[in-house]
């Protein structure tokens, strides 16, 4: 991993702030044609509490700042040989040890890129209560994921850049200094966060199965793909399942079955 990093920051009159950063990263985990990525971010903030129109409120509003930032950063494959086809040993052929290909090469593998917008407020009241609020939206492009392959290929999956995903949410933190003396202090901290996740686009297929999860356009990345449990038969205690068989019109039946192999996953 090699990185070149630079940043510029500017502040004026303790009220207005701006920043810019840039980095260029190169990694041997990617092929020579795709291993370099350019990432950047811009930010700005306005300290309202320093403005003259806030003077009448200075005993209440100790500090207040509005923040905004936008930028892109990158993620690498977790493995060292993501773009290589690799071999392993341990099998025997005609009594002789033999290597075999256990991972398929992907020379087009590239950086996963996150485009993030963040808007925030920092607020201090009575010099005792501090509130931080952030709203964000993050779009991930060239999403890194193991895509399942047809078994006729001889491989189970391939690591590839499959599409686009979006996260949107907010974070709130409230901190208070309730008691502050020489011998005793009492502070309180509360936080709340919420995130909504959705796969926007998949490259080749509208959906594919990944273990007990389904990766599907319009659904969360962590959408579970299992047989639907219908409870326990009160007569004999056997587990029951909804069959969820789909007809030609796309409607699913809700018949009860006892063998999980007779039920479709949803």
Predicted regions located by residue number:
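Conserved small-residue
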Residues: 160, 179-266
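Membrane-embedded beta-barrel scaffold of Gram-negative outer-membrane proteins
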Residues: 111-154, 186, 193, 197
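Transmembrane beta-strands of outer-membrane beta-barrel proteins
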Residues: 18-20, 59-68, 119, 131, ...
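Repeated loop/turn-to-beta-strand initiation elements of outer-membrane beta-barrel proteins
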Residues: 15-18, 51-54, 127-131, 170, ...
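Outer-membrane beta-barrel signature, preferentially recognizing the C-terminal barrel domain
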Residues: 1-5, 91-130, 157-181, 218-223
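Transmembrane beta-strands of outer-membrane beta-barrel pores
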Residues: 22-28, 48-50, 70-74, 135-141, ...
């Amino acid at each position: 991993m090699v990185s070149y990093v630079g940043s510029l920051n500017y502040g004026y009159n303790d009220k207005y702030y701006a920043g810019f950063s840039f980095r260029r990263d190169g990694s041997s985990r990617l092929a020579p044609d795709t291993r370099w990525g350019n990432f950047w971010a811009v930010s700005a903030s306005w300290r309202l509490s320093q403005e003259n129109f806030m003077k009448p409120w200075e005993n209440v509003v100790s500090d207040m700042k509005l923040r905004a930032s936008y930028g892109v950063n990158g993620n690498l494959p977790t493995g060292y040989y993501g773009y290589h086809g690799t071999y392993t040993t341990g099998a025997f052929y005609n009594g002789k040890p033999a290597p075999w290909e256990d991972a398929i090469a992907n020379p087009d593998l590239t950086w996963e890129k996150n485009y993030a917008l963040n808007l925030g407020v920092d607020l201090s009241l009575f010099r005792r209560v501090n509130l931080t609020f952030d709203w964000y939206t993050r779009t991930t492009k060239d999403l890194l994921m193991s895509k399942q392959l047809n078994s006729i290929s001889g491989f189970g999956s391939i690591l590839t850049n499959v599409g686009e995903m979006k996260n949107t949410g907010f974070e709130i933190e409230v901190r208070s200094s309730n008691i502050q003396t020489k011998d005793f202090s009492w502070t309180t901290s509360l936080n709340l966060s919420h995130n909504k996740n959705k796969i926007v686009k998949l490259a080749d297929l509208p959906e594919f199965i990944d273990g007990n999860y389904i990766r599907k356009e319009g659904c969360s990345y962590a959408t579970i793909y299992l047989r639907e449990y219908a409870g326990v038969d009160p007569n004999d205690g056997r587990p029951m399942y909804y069959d969820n068989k789909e007809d030609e019109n796309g409607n699913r039946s809700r018949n009860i079955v006892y063998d999980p192999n007779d039920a479709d996953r949803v």
